[in-house]
């Protein structure tokens, strides 16, 4: 899936070079220049802008993307430059909040747009082969989308209007709250 695609794309788009620092943690190589995504909210991490030093704040949020600008092995830290121009420093122990984002799932892409998208359908579980997933994937692209799959897969998705039921317990919580 996306994990394996990220490994392949990292080697193609950001291959090892003598001038790029890198390190391994949890069977993953992190390299200067790698595309990364914040995968959970961190309300406390400090950020700043180099072009406007007095502008600083706290908080990097789920779905924000950027690239590894510097790796500081002795300090066991990395500096990330986010796409909006903010810099944040992460200790190696905080890297569970980040993952590579050369390839991401449709779910993680929601709320984002990209100039170009490639939608790979091979190996997609049947429960995710729905019209709304296909629509969401296609509408992430601003300029061009390429769908890699068979006509049958695309037709199945386009015709499959089944909705995945979600059992959140929200109705029960609201009813309990109303009874209180």
Regions found by a protein language model. Give the residues of each.
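Conserved helicase/translocase motor-coupling segment
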Residues: 1-62
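C-terminal accessory regions
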Residues: 49-51, 55-58, 62-180
């Amino acid at each position: 899936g996306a994990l394996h695609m990220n490994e392949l794309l990292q080697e193609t788009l950001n291959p090892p070079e003598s001038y790029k620092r890198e390190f391994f943690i949890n069977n993953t190589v992190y390299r200067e220049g790698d595309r990364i995504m914040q995968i959970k909210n961190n309300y406390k991490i400090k950020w700043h802008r180099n072009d406007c030093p007095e502008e600083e704040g706290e908080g990097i949020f789920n779905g924000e993307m950027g690239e590894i600008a510097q790796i500081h092995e002795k300090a066991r830290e990395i500096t990330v430059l986010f796409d909006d121009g903010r810099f944040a420093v992460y200790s190696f122990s905080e890297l569970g909040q980040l993952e590579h984002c050369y390839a991401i799932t449709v779910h993680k892409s929601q709320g984002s747009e990209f100039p170009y998208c490639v939608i790979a359908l091979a190996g997609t579980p049947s429960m995710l082969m729905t019209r709304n997933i296909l629509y969401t994937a296609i509408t992430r692209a601003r300029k061009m989308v390429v769908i890699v799959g068979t006509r049958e897969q695309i037709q199945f998705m386009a015709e499959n209007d089944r909705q995945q039921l979600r059992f959140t317990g929200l109705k029960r919580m609201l009813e309990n709250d109303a009874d209180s």
